[in-house]
Amino acid sequence: MRGGTANCCVVISEEEIICPIVLEPTELIAMNLPSLLKFEPTVVKGGTIFVNSSIITEKVTRDDVRAIYVPCLDIANELGNAKVANMVMLGAYIEAMGNLGVETIKEMLVHMFTGPKAKLVDLNIEALRRGAACVK
């Protein structure tokens, strides 16, 4: 949605997920200021907030969460495609949280991008790598 917030809750678990509704997330990825302002208060104490610092100049106001600032759009533009800003953030998330494997994501990309779109695999992998480097 342009000019507002859009959100999606993702539950990662090795056990059966009974209810996918998340009222108090352990992590938040804020790609724009309205999303940060709306969802920052919902993150649990001790949680992690990832901020797209290319667009959001404000800092996380809470001191009971970990804040990670990633210049997603700047990096994506350096790579020549603003559409991979989300992959830059995913790379930072994977590096910081350690609950997903980069190899798993790479396998998914190879599976998803076939035929003429196969050329996008390397771009997306580089975006992941650059995002991860922001956290190291």
Regions found by a protein language model. Give the residues of each.
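Active-site cofactor/cluster-binding pocket
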Residues: 1-136
